[in-house]
């Protein structure tokens, strides 16, 4: 079985459009086979965005890690006027994100990166709905690795379900970050982590 965090060049392409509404704004995104949550914006991403936007409304420099087809970055640009770099290990996801950037006349940037391998900048916020199925080592690389790409008072925002180890992962990050649970609904936990 193929996962959305791998690249399968031979996977058939069936690009389609999905609609998403948040804060009375409507978005239409291109999606395709082989990307995360291709049929609709998943609940975790939706809750992460709503919680973030309830807490932060200013224009910031943001990195969206594991951007999928670009939902988080494009919504944040539209709602907060933030400048967002969007990265993914899945080349099809990066291609779709670039299509959605063009469609929405966005100034955001999307590029391939294995975790932070191609990231050269620092950010006010790093935000992610991380790929849980990559395993603990890669997941911790994404979450702990964010620290060196955060500005001095930067924040890492992420979502993990409680039954997927959200609280266990939080404990593993407590040497690196001061972490606060900003919201919890339907088993999903929204975390905001600030560097110690």
Report the location of each language-model feature.
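Conserved class I S-adenosyl-L-methionine
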Residues: 161-177
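A short glycine-rich, Lys/Arg-flanked "PGG" loop and its adjoining helix->strand segment in the class I
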Residues: 140-152
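N-terminal auxiliary segments of SAM/dcSAM-dependent transferases
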Residues: 1-23, 34-37
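Conserved SAM/SAH cofactor-binding pocket of Class I
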Residues: 44-128
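Conserved beta-strand signature within the Rossmann-like core of class I S-adenosyl-L-methionine
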Residues: 153-161
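Conserved SAM-binding loop and adjacent beta-strand
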Residues: 32-50
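Core SAM-dependent methyltransferase catalytic element
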Residues: 183-196
């Amino acid at each position: 079985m193929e996962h959305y965090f791998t690249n399968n060049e031979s996977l058939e392409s069936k690009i389609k459009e999905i609609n998403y509404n948040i804060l009375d704004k409507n978005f239409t995104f291109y999606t395709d086979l082989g990307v995360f949550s291709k049929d609709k914006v998943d609940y975790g991403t939706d809750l992460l965005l709503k919680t973030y936007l309830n807490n932060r409304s200013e224009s910031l420099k943001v990195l969206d890690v594991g951007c999928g087809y670009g939902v988080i970055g494009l919504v944040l640009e539209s709602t907060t006027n933030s400048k967002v770099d969007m990265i993914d290990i899945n080349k099809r996801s990066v291609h779709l994100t670039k299509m959605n950037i063009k469609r929405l006349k966005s100034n955001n940037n999307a590029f391939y990166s294995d975790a932070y391998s191609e990231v050269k900048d620092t950010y006010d916020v790093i935000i992610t709905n991380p790929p849980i199925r990559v395993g603990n080592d890669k997941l911790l690389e994404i979450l702990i690795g964010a620290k060196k790409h955060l500005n001095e008072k930067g924040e890492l925002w992420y979502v993990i379900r409680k039954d997927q180890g959200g609280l266990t992962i939080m404990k593993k990050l407590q040497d690196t970050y001061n972490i606060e649970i900003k919201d919890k609904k339907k088993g999903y936990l929204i975390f905001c982590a600030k560097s110690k």
